[in-house]
Structure formats: C-alpha cells, structure tokens
Swiss-Prot record:
Protein name per Swiss-Prot or TrEMBL: Homoserine O-succinyltransferase
Annotated function: Transfers a succinyl group from succinyl-CoA to L-homoserine, forming succinyl-L-homoserine.
Keyword Cytoplasm: yes
Species this protein is from: Shewanella loihica (strain ATCC BAA-1088 / PV-4)
EC number: 2.3.1.46
Family annotation (NCBIfam families): metA
Length: 321
C-alpha cells in the first residue's frame, strides 16, 4: 500500500522513480480507507534527504500511511529552504491536540553535546512526554533513542573516543517477538554516532528488552515492555551513499575521520560502498508499522485508551534454540 504525502513534496519524484508506491493527498481523499497516521519529527540537517529515506521505508509496507512532518522550531535551516519548511512542516502547537498511530523521531548531529545543553532539549522532552499519551507507538532513531532512554528511564550514555561509523553485524537475542519476524539470526545495520548505551544497563532495566545487539556496535534494538517505544540505535533508513557523504564531509572539515567499517568494498574508501542493510531496514519498519502500530492502535484515534497490548507471551519469550 502507498504512503500518502503532501502534494508536490520533492521526495515524491525520487520515490516514484524507484518504484516506491506514493499517493498524493488529492488522490487519497477519494479512497475510503483508514490509513495509519504517522508523524515524523525530523531533526536531521538535510530535511529532504531524511524525508526521502523514511518515506522510502514507509512506502514499502503493506499499509496505507498518512504522514505529517513536524519541525522542532521555526528557525532557518542551513540545508533546507524556509519555503520547504513552511510548506510541508508543522509546528508542535498545530498537532498537540491530535493523536497519531505512530511517531518517528530521527537522529540528530548532536552526539557530543550533553542533552541539557541542546538548545531545543525542553522541546524534545515535551514531545516525548506528549507522545506517551497521544501516540500508539514511537520509533526513536539513533540520537533520539539515546535522548529518550535518558529522559524516560534515566539511563546515561557513554561518549566514545571516536565516531562509530560503519555497517556492523548484529544478532537477534530473542526470536518470539513480532518485531523480529522474518529476521535472519544475523543481519547488518549502519551506525554513525559518538556515543552508546551500555548493553548491561539496558538489560538490567525492568521496563526494557534488548532484542538485537552487535559485538562491535553494542545494543541495536531495544523495546519497552509495554511495546509502545522502540529504540533503534543505528540508521536502518540510510541510503547507500549516506555514510560516504558523511565521511567525505568530515574529511573536508579536517576532522580526520576513521573510514566507515565494513562499508566500502575492501574497506577502501576509493572503492564503491556496498549496501547490505536495505532488506533488514525495510523489514524492521514494516514489522514495526504492522505489529506495533496497526495491530495495537484503536480504530478511533480519539480514544487512546483502546490500545490493545500484545499478549504476555510476546513480552518475555526467550530464544532458547
């Protein structure tokens, strides 16, 4: 099924050229279908690139998705025109009174800044708190996952000595969760961050479950016990060239970055990158949208008390094979 996006959104042309099913608001208005309403809080500098990456994943799911784009403030962006922001993005005050089936909060290039020193930290906290009462399921990506784990559960992240960049192998630590249906025992996912959450701290917290982790990159998929919050420590949405673009940007800025691991063919930055995570990324978002949004959300979004939780067996079933 398609993802419904605003008429004339630039991402539409790119996605249609990739054979991703998108639908304009005008066409969708003529269909009598209850779409999943998903809000995206886009904190990345290049808004259009991130929109396209996320819409690409949402457009590959079997559900019709109605997307609203949210901005954290109305300040001028260095990488995105003010016209684009005003035309396609909403301020929080415009959606505060609404309920949504799903919310995606993206990463942000703030990995070395203390949370309380982020200029819009109070806004982030407010939106996270709001989401716990107005959204069926929230998907936090990378920096947003760290920020939410800190705000909701008081967990501290650990700064790394160097940026962790690359494509890393991960293992499932459970098998009986709907989120992991169709997953291989091992799979790849990109990471690009300056901090990590300690796996031991996450596993010790009674309200959290670590579903996948990496020997090199640490925890990757963490789910709250109430199945309402999914924390993804990497970037399953990244396109093939994203890590290369970040690496070349850091080189140009004189930051002496490490070559992203397991990314360029032969780990040689003069060679083309190898994308080996797109299948996993699509399956992850599809499973989240189906099992943790569509299957749990009330038909009438005005009544969030009607959210249907998963049975207990899905919460604690260990992979004992």
């Amino acid at each position: 099924m398609p993802v419904k996006i605003p008429d004339n959104l630039p991402a539409a042309e790119i996605l249609e050229s990739e054979n991703i099913f998108v639908m304009s608001e005008t066409r969708a208005a003529n269909q009598d279908i209850r779409p999943m309403k998903v809000l995206i809080l886009n904190l990345m500098p290049n808004k259009i690139e991130t929109e396209t990456q996320l819409l690409r994943l949402l457009g590959n799911t079997p559900l019709q998705v109605d997307v609203d784009l949210l901005r954290i403030h109305d300040k001028v962006s260095k990488h995105t025109s003010i016209d684009h922001m005003n035309n396609f993005y909403r301020d929080f005050e415009a959606v505060r009174h609404k309920n949504y089936d799903g919310l995606i909060i993206t990463g942000a290039p703030l990995g070395q800044i203390e949370f309380e020193e982020v200029t819009y930290w109070d806004h982030i906290r407010e939106i996270i708190d709001w989401s716990q009462h107005h959204v069926t399921s929230v998907l936090f990506l990378c920096w947003a996952a760290h920020a939410a784990l800190y705000h909701l559960y008081g967990l501290q992240r650990k700064l790394l000595s160097a940026k962790r960049s690359g494509v890393f192998n991960h293992q499932r630590t459970h098998k009986h969760f709907p989120l992991l249906r169709g997953f291989d025992d091992e799979f790849f996912a990109p990471h690009s961050r300056f901090a990590e959450m300690e796996v031991a701290d996450l596993k010790a917290h009674k309200e959290l479950q670590v579903l996948a982790e990496s020997d090199e990159a640490g925890a990757y998929l963490v789910l709250s016990r109430n199945n309402r919050n999914l924390f993804v420590m990497g970037h399953p949405e990244y396109q093939k060239s994203t890590l290369k673009d970040e690496y070349q940007r850091d080189l140009a800025e004189g930051l002496n970055p490490r070559v992203p691991k397991n990314y360029f063919r032969g780990d040689d930055p003069s060679q083309a990158p190898v994308a080996r995570w797109h299948g996993h990324g699509s399956l992850l978002v599809s499973n989240w949208l189906n099992y943790y949004v569509y299957q749990l959300t009330p038909y009438d979004l005005h009544d969030m008390s009607a959210i249907t939780p998963w049975e207990h067996e899905y919460k604690d079933a260990e992979d004992n094979d």
